[in-house]
Structures are given as structure tokens and as C-alpha cells.
Amino acid sequence: PERINPGDKQHRLPSIRKVTAGSNSTSAEFIDQLYQRIITAGTHKASSIKVAEAAKVIENTQRDLNIALINELAMLFNKLGIDTREVLDAAGSKWNFLPFSPGLVGGHCISVDPYYLTHKAQEIGYHPEVILAGRKINDGMGAYVAEQVIKLMTRKKIAVVDSKILVLGFTFKENCPDIRNTLVA
């Protein structure tokens, strides 16, 4: 499975450990050896293609859920009149706090991969509640941000109708030209 980080100048293809697999032991070994020549960070040979692909899907699903948690907390703190950034800075002073920021989740992986997993789960009769709840929160963030902008404009007595608003950050992450599944549009 693909493991790249577009726009990241530090974590490039050779420095990201690669999960490999094959349809049989011969092809798995060949593929693993091939990638070991390119990937200086090393490889992790999975026992099957299913395991390798499932690993990729949960990497992105975990990130999506972590962002959904922070998004939900940001909406809650907003209602409580507490500065989310200040809370995150304070919580980040603990060594094992995971640093995530609230915001829109788009792109071709993080916002899509959880749906592959939930679709497969539902095919076998399992209802993945937490994953779907996270997707619902993140899918709704575009509307939430728009509502907050309108509320702020109204409070500042800025006419909403016919206003022009500059949006900085149309892609799913900085320094990346990919606009697939952007929540800004």
C-alpha cells in the first residue's frame, strides 16, 4: 500500500517504512527485496495483501478519528467560551498527548479510506459506530466553519449577502496542490 506524505519535505518515500505483501510467498519476498533497495527506513513484510491493505486503511481511519475528536472538542469549547488552541497547548504539555488540530478533513485518503472499511464491515453485518460517527463529524465541519464565519460577520455587522470572502487553504494540507475531496468548495 501507498505510504507517502505529500508536501512533507522531511518524510519522503525512502524515509517512510514500507509495508509489503504479495499474492504468494515468492512474490511477497521479491516485492519486499525490491523495496528494501529503495526504502532506507526498511520494510515490514505483512503475511498477506489483506493485512497490508487493512493496515493502510486503519492508519488513515485512526487519523480521521483523532481529528474528529479534536473537531468535536473544538465545537464544545466554542460553546463553552473556551479557547481551543489554548486548551490544546496546555494538554500538549503532557508527554503522551497526541497533537491534532481541529479543521477540515479532505483529500483522497483520510476522508475516503474510513468508508472502505465501514462498507466492508457492513457487508459482513457489522455496524462500525465510532468510525461512522467520526466521519459524520468531519464531513460536517465545512458547514460548521461556514456557520461560524456567518455568525462572526453578523456580530461585526458585516453584510453576509454579496460579501466576498477569501479562503486560504483550498487543498487538504499545506504545500500540496491536490484538491480532491476538498471541503472548501
Predicted regions located by residue number:
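Structural/interface elements that position substrates and couple domains in central-metabolism enzymes
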Residues: P1-A185
